[in-house]
Amino acid sequence: IYLYRNDENRFEIYDLNEDDQMPYVIMNSMSVAEFRGSSQSNVLWTTLDCIKAWNRTRSEFGPIPFRYAFKRIWEGGHGDQSQHYAGVAFDCGQVLSQEERNRLHTIATRLDVWSYVEPLYLTPTWVHFDKRYGQSACSAGYPLLRKGDRGIYVLIMQDALNALGYNTRFLDGDFGE
């Protein structure tokens, strides 16, 4: 697990098992397996800010069932540019009643800890929220990357380049100098 600390511009790296809890989560609310979901990857990433937003939402709402969080860009399933590839998005509440999904959406919006909470009319059977960061360079929320940048969006770029056959030598989230 690569956990990017936005506040310190650095990664913490964890070697965890599927049954372990994700770093920094409260109340045993998210295992590595749950975060990974249907992804086949053994390398995952997210941010501390995303986990903090999850914790606030979890504290307010209670247990949050979710099916989709992390995906690698080459696994697809979420379009060309998705915050799921950044490990900062959750599709939640598929098994909740409409009333409970509405409540989750209201809480996620009211807490103001997420960068984006998708309107309910776009996701009628789930609730999507994400914790993107940086100044968006496109509608999907991806920032413009420059040499010297570090973070999960650099990991996505490295991952995409590797998937296209370009050898970036590393999957480390560091664009270099």
Model-derived regions, located:
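Extracytoplasmic cell-surface/polysaccharide-interacting catalytic and binding patches
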Residues: 1-60, 108, 122, 132-139, ...
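Extended, low-complexity, intrinsically disordered C-terminal regulatory tails
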Residues: 48-79
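Surface-exposed patches in mature extracellular/periplasmic domains of secreted proteins
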Residues: 62-70, 115-121, 170-172
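Short linear motifs at secondary-structure transitions and domain/linker junctions
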Residues: 41-44, 65-72, 92-95, 101-107
